[in-house]
């Protein structure tokens, strides 16, 4: 499990390899990740948008930006949490993801809540020892 906290917003990510959605012989590896966002702060916040950096095992970086998460822009009161699961296909058996959520307060202030960097590792990864 991976965790980051920004201004009272805790983001926890738990990734996993999805064998049944993958086809290693065709260089297709699918990963799912479950995210929990907890408002440990003292004011209401709303998740407005997301920004992901996805880096495959060859170092190729893809950036993904969009409104909300899984079609939602959840409002979190102090003490509330929101969880969702999404997925990421790669053409390599490993990679990593990191990013941020743009959050806004009731007063209209925006800030970036860090999404911790997390590794995507499949059992098909061949480790080389020199």
Swiss-Prot record:
It holds the Pfam family DUF525. InterPro entries: ApaG_domain, ApaG_sf, Uncharacterised_ApaG. Residues 3-127 form the ApaG domain. One of its GO terms (biological process) is error-free translesion synthesis. Gene3D superfamilies: ApaG domain. Signal peptide: none annotated. HAMAP family: ApaG (MF_00791). PANTHER family: F-BOX ONLY PROTEIN 3 (PTHR14289), POLYMERASE DELTA-INTERACTING PROTEIN 2 (PTHR14289:SF16). This is Protein ApaG. It comes from Methylorubrum populi (strain ATCC BAA-705 / NCIMB 13946 / BJ001).
């Amino acid at each position: 499990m991976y965790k980051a906290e920004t201004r009272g917003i805790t983001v926890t990510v738990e990734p996993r390899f999805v064998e049944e959605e993958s086809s290693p012989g065709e260089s297709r590896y699918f990963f799912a990740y479950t995210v929990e966002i907890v408002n440990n702060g003292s004011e209401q916040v709303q998740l407005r948008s997301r920004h992901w950096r996805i880096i495959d095992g060859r170092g190729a970086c893809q950036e993904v930006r969009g409104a909300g998460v899984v079609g939602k822009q959840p409002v979190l009161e102090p003490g509330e949490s929101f969880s969702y699961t999404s997925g990421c296909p790669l053409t390599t058996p490993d990679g990593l993801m990191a990013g941020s959520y743009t959050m806004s307060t009731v007063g209209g202030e925006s800030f970036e809540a860090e999404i911790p960097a997390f590794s995507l590792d499949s059992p098909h990864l061949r480790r080389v020892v020199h």
